[in-house]
């Protein structure tokens, strides 16, 4: 989500099951260079031990002008089985 100027907000979350033993989320900011998407930076978060079924990540980041998206990997482990989900955000263009 563009915030104005050259700042963006990246928010990702994962909600698992009540008996989940862990939830994790990775968010990778990607910039479009020509016809390719190039990884810029990756952030990771893991659920706290007191609340294993939920993880949130809210990041504010300054970027140069360009076209961006976020690729996120969400995982939840329950009863020894880990499920994964992969998502792309909308594409945003930052220009001053």
Regions found by a protein language model. Name each.
Residues 1-96:
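Mature extracytoplasmic or otherwise solvent-exposed domains
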């Amino acid at each position: 989500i563009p915030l104005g100027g050259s700042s963006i907000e990246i928010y990702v979350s994962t909600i698992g099951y009540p008996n989940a033993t862990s939830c994790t989320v990775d968010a990778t900011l990607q910039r479009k260079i020509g016809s390719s998407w190039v990884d810029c930076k990756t952030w990771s978060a893991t659920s706290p031990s007191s609340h294993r079924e939920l993880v949130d990540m809210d990041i504010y980041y300054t970027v140069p002008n360009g076209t961006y998206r976020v690729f996120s990997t969400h995982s939840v482990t329950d009863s020894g089985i880990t499920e994964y989900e992969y998502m792309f955000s909308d594409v945003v263009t930052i220009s001053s």
